[in-house]
């Protein structure tokens, strides 16, 4: 095995766009739902983890094998998610040196930084499936409890087998599209120096920054005291119940 192309579908109660992948995977509710992969460009295989299937041992070994190059579109997401799945402690992750990101390749070529956008510009035969956004919202995020859904806060495969089947197809197609991007750009390789920069970037992000938590906690306390003091002064000055209210403050200013 020389290369492993990967795409994951995951669940977490943390909003990925707001928290970033590191906080996202630290949630106790985080889990990998679907694992689609291709070994050395072979037809895509899929592991339905949500329904009890297991990742083959040779694939698990390949994830930690520096001799196997792992590919994904926005590979940082797959690498960090799989680190959590493999039981790495918080702050420790799969080494980035054996990972390459086709989004970086797309960026190097001036293409859109999305799988859908890059595929469209390149005119790929197998485009990213458009219905994916709705399926991700359905299966990958908490849902609002309602009478019609039995007050549940999460949608599982059993709640909509048809949608789950479509979601599995979407997951497989993402790997196919990612591999097609690689094939189309094969004549325009990313220089080794750029991959070195990418790996350094990943190490920096994995390491994070040191934070003086005592200073942070004190700053929060000072902010609370300051807000209370300023609000009290404004109440004394204006006699308003809530001087933070724009409507009340406008009315006071016009008196």
Residue locations for each model-derived region?
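A short alpha/beta connector and helix-capping loop motif
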Residues: 15-36
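Cytochrome P450 core scaffold surrounding the K-helix E-X-X-R motif
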Residues: 13-17, 46-49
